[in-house]
Amino acid sequence: MNQKKEAIYDARELGVPKMLLLGLQHMFAMFGATILVPILVNTYFNGEGLSIQVTLICAGIGTLFFHLCTKLKVPAFLGSSFAFLGGFHTVANLDTGIFKDMSMGEKLPYACGGIVVAGALYLVLALVVKLVGVKRVMRFLPPVVTGPIIICIGLSLAPSAVNNAKTNWILAIIAFAVIVIFNIWGKGMFKIIPILMGVVISYVVAFILFKCGVHNPDGSAIFTFKAVKDAGWVDLPPFQLCKFNITSILVMAPIALATMMEHIGDISAISATTGNNFIKDPGLHRTQIGDGLATAFAAAFGGPANTTYGENTGVLELSRVYDPRVVRLAAVYAILLSFSPKVAECIGSLPASIIGGVSFMLYGMISAIGVRNVVENKVDFTKSRNLIVAAVILVSGLGFGNGITFTVAGTSITLTSLAIAAILGIALNAILPGKDYEFDE
């Protein structure tokens, strides 16, 4: 019962049907967060914001771009980035210059144009990494920095898990319990798809309760199927081309400095999970190129910025299937769903409480990976400098809940708490004497 599951690096040995199910599991893990970004942006733009269909197809194609750039080696899914929400909100509220008489829908392409430039900044960093060498770059990112950052990635998501779960604790607990049961006691295929089983079984329970007239504790309905009924079966995603303006560029592009730090943390987490050093091979410059191209492509056609997803790192840890082919299947599913508004809305109808129950496990797993990263690399916490670096990262990553917002050229720029933690951690590690870690090339 307590034996560690053997890692699977080639899912083809499981057979096609099982691979398809594993891809479905990754898709469910990313779906809620991916479609939440356009939902939130729509509130900023009074219903004239991002399209869920465009978001899904851009996430799918962006993920495939990323895999091509990384030699098909890194099992990462790229979904919608939350880091740019503050930028979208700022652009929506611009009312000077060319934005003075614009409708909300007319402002959106300019926000996307700023994200295209942000994607280009990733390519600049990739060039720097390639020119100076990853070893020199990684001198600033030892385990005493990346480990606590990974811990913060998971813990910073924890409030989201609790907020979703508390809408109906019964369903959340069922989803969580099913995942634990299948992960610990499951046999064969069921042992490597615990999240998918948690989603399916809790969804069935929720639907039965819904049909029996049971409501959430706050009186709201467990399901809302109006959007499903109104959606068509097949429709093309409503693409729109981005536009450029220096004001919106100054709002959106600097956010890339924050998301680049998060990217390094995510790639470190995936490396720690799979036991493969992806910062070394295929290289940090390649992962940055993949993320940058995916972000620029998505925004060019009216989608949100893409980013490597921590949720899918949690899936990797639970299933112990590390084959990137499975993640590419999830990308294909996302692309297919983008052409069917009705199916997308059906999956989107998944109760928030179930998402919360699943997230309890996934987000905790991410933080546990960070702890493991520190332990396996034998970080010496008897040294005061290591304690200080880790302490500042943890407090900053969890303490600056909404980040820090400051004004540049009359526009607001927000550094997320994770970006602040990464910047402070990297700076302290560089300044304080007594470094005891060498990156292995």
What are these regions (language model features)?
Residues 1-21, 214-238, 272-276, 287, ...:
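Intrinsically disordered, low-complexity non-transmembrane regions of multi-pass membrane transporters
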Residues 17-32, 171-175, 193-194, 235-266, ...:
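Hydrophobic, membrane-embedded alpha-helices of multi-pass small-molecule transporters
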Residues 103-213, 331-441:
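Membrane-embedded alpha-helical modules
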Residues 88-93, 183, 312-327, 333-337:
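Interfacial segments of multi-pass membrane proteins
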Residues 42-67, 254-324:
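Membrane-embedded helical hairpins/re-entrant loop segments and their flanking transmembrane helices
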Residues 49-50, 72-84, 137-146, 191-197, ...:
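Short, non-helical or kinked segments that cap or interrupt transmembrane helices
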Residues 2-4, 34-38, 42, 175-182, ...:
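Juxtamembrane interface elements at the cytosolic ends of transmembrane helices
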